[in-house]
């Protein structure tokens, strides 16, 4: 499992770290990653990040921790 904790980042910095993590996860063949955003400003933006991300299939909040998301990564296309 790959986990990304975005606590302590600004929204812009958090987006860059998130985007790099999803791209890395795609190319490494991960099925999903956990992204911790907390309950602040980033949590308001996070679902839009996932919708716009070409490497993400879907994202779901963890029931036990609403500040964390399970991000399902798209399957890697052969040769890419």
Which residue ranges define each predicted feature?
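N-terminal targeting/trafficking signals and adjacent low-complexity tails
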Residues: 1-80
């Amino acid at each position: 499992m790959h986990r990304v904790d975005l606590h302590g980042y600004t929204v812009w910095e958090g987006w860059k770290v998130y985007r790099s993590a999803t791209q890395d996860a795609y190319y490494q063949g991960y099925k999903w990653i956990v992204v911790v955003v907390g309950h602040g400003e980033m949590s308001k933006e996070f679902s839009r990040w996932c919708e716009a991300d070409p490497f993400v299939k879907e994202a779901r909040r963890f029931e036990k921790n609403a500040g964390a998301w399970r991000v399902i990564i798209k399957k890697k296309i052969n040769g890419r």
